[in-house]
Amino acid sequence: MKKVIALAAALLTALCACADPNAFSEGERLSDSVKKNQNAAETFNYADGASEPPTSYNNYANAVTDFSLKLLRKRLDVTPGKSVLCSPANTALTLSLLSNGASGDTKSEILLQFGGLSADDLNTCGSYFQSRMEEVAQTQRDKKAEDYDPLDGAHVSLLQNLTVSQNYDISASFLQKSADFYGADVIRVSFDDEKLEQKQRSLLSGYNANASVSADAGSSLYALTASSLTDKWLAKHTIEEGEFRGSGSAEKTSFMVSDESYLSTDAAEGIVAYTADNPLKFIAVVPKNGVSVQDYIDKLGNAEFDGLLNSMKAGKTVRAAIPCFSIDGGSKALSLRSALEGCGLHTVFTDDAHWKYMNITDRIKLDDLYELPPSVTVSDSGILAEAQTGGVIKPNGNDKQVTLNSKKELRFDKPFAFFFIDNESNIPVYAGVYQ
């Protein structure tokens, strides 16, 4: 999907140079110089015809889920008491991409984050995961239509971007792997270019029209992720008014009410709801026994996460009342360096790191990995998650006559954790806490 966006932008620029004078030039877009391998047997790209994941996919899913939960903990530690939303899967994809350029202990450090899988495993598994996420909702659309826009309507889009100083060459083999497995935008520029911020904003305009990335003139290389999700709910909801007791005072809000699959462990309970077009499940979880959501996330690991998902039984439902809510991530790219160092990437961002397979001189340095923080609006109208939403989607109130059969009720009227996870691998595409 990202290649479609990039090619469309490039075509528009070629047809009318005045349309976007701040776009990166053809010479700056190193990724555009490489032709993607479309052999699905080698790349496991779902859009190119891959129907089964690689044999190492289960191990990959477990490793990325574990990493995602760690990253959520670190993100929540930075802003205790505040709502948080991130796309840990996209960060994992970016680190996987970078592993192709890393060498020595730097490469080992990245691979250890994902259970010691090889870089080749990360490439093929990441390619299958990302391409499936981005393609499923697009299969019913005419991609050849003049008005086709991959970010219009139901979609998932995960963007990875590497921006490198013009002082460094990037190896052809690294660019080829980036194209084959990730479709990342690899840009080479002068970091003291006074138009750099405008150019980056142009690149990210499909995700956030006001995106801001702070890069020092002496920078060598930085990575950036951005993401977008839009969909409707598979099930219908009725609307009830109530109060949400967050970290501050209680606030009146609208609650979406529906029968949903019930989850429960000794530590927490929750629900599973499904999106209509994307291959995603929405998981909402509230701790038991008076435990705060912060303390619950601090201890949340694969065992508890799997326990929740495995507790789902056919026909076991609950009358779920979920608040309509929004989280505003803003437009400034957030540094993940400290959070990733806390996850165990101790040397990746230092002068001791080695990137010989990205730059043969091995002089390049990764200054930071940024995320353009997604915002989210969740209501009975659906889900809108992007770098910055335009505002709250108001409840439409069209489903007042929904029949509810569940006797047990679970109200999410206090801080809770939530996830949008892949319905095949259970990898968290988005992870957050609303409080």
Locations of the language-model features?
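Short Gly/aromatic-enriched secondary-structure transition segments
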Residues: 110-114, 237-244, 295-302
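Positively charged n-region of N-terminal signal peptides that target proteins for export
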Residues: 1-4, 8
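Non-catalytic interaction/Regulatory regions outside core domains
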Residues: 18, 26-48, 362-364, 375, ...
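Detector for small/aliphatic-rich hydrophobic stretches
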Residues: 5, 18-189
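Internal alpha/beta scaffold segment
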Residues: 287-314
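Non-catalytic, conformational "gating/processing" segments within enzyme and secreted inhibitor domains
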Residues: 81-82, 117-289, 311-400
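Extended hydrophobic
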Residues: 269-285, 401-435
